[in-house]
From Swiss-Prot:
Site residues, Required for high affinity binding to PTRZ1 by interacting with the chondroitin sulfate chains of PTRZ1: 100
Induction data: By retinoic acid. Induced after tissue damage. Induced by inflammatory cells, in particular, CD4(+) T cells under inflammatory conditions. Induced during the early and intermediate phase of fracture repair.
Main localization, broad class: secreted
Coiled-coil intervals: none
Tissue/organ expression: Expressed in the follicular epithelium and granulosa cells of the ovary.
Entries under PROSITE patterns matching the protein: PTN_MK_1, PTN_MK_2
Alphabetical keyword list: Developmental protein, Differentiation, Disulfide bond, Growth factor, Heparin-binding, Mitogen, Secreted, Signal
GO CC annotations on file: cell projection; extracellular region
Organism encoding this protein: Mus musculus (Mouse)
Name by which UniProt lists this protein: Midkine
Function statement: Secreted protein that functions as a cytokine and growth factor and mediates its signal through cell-surface proteoglycan and non-proteoglycan receptors. Binds cell-surface proteoglycan receptors via their chondroitin sulfate (CS) groups. Thereby regulates many processes like inflammatory response, cell proliferation, cell adhesion, cell growth, cell survival, tissue regeneration, cell differentiation and cell migration. Participates in inflammatory processes by exerting two different activities.
GO MF annotation terms: chondroitin sulfate binding; growth factor activity; heparan sulfate binding; heparin binding
Similarity annotation: Belongs to the pleiotrophin family.
Length: 140
């Protein structure tokens, strides 16, 4: 008799747990009906960089999520396009710049990115002055 009561209690507990898991799965399905989200660019709340928002749409649903635009991003190719860059090339004497090429490593949030990009920067002069005046301690 005692074994039968224990068995019924265990069976009842199993049913309760199973129904709770089923309800949880149902809630997840309702919230994730949309599978193809289209995300816009991250728009900083103030200035050119820092914290901001990104809007996403899927059918009639719209979501707004927090995002961050790094302050060292290059506007030409966007903050959501991540590139792997080669080493800087030699200095071009006629233009006074050096260049390197980057290949697309990752496009975040379905961003439209170029496969390869080329960036330039001014050549730096080789002669940098490293001499600094040393301050003596109070003897004049």
């Amino acid at each position: 008799m005692q074994h039968r009561g224990f068995f019924l209690l265990a069976l009842l507990a199993l049913l309760v747990v199973t129904s709770a898991v089923a309800k949880k799965k149902e809630k997840v399905k309702k919230g994730s009906e949309c599978s193809e989200w289209t995300w816009g660019p991250c728009t900083p709340s103030s200035k050119d960089c820092g914290m901001g928002f990104r809007e996403g749409t899927c059918g009639a649903q719209t979501q707004r999520v927090h995002c961050k635009v790094p302050c060292n991003w290059k506007k030409e190719f966007g903050a959501d396009c991540k590139y792997k860059f080669e080493s800087w090339g030699a200095c071009d004497g006629s233009t006074g710049t050096k260049a390197r090429q980057g290949t697309l490593k990752k496009a975040r949030y379905n961003a439209q990115c170029q496969e390869t990009i080329r960036v330039t920067k001014p050549c730096t002069s080789k002669t940098k002055s490293k001499t600094k005046a040393k301050k003596g301690k109070g003897k004049d």
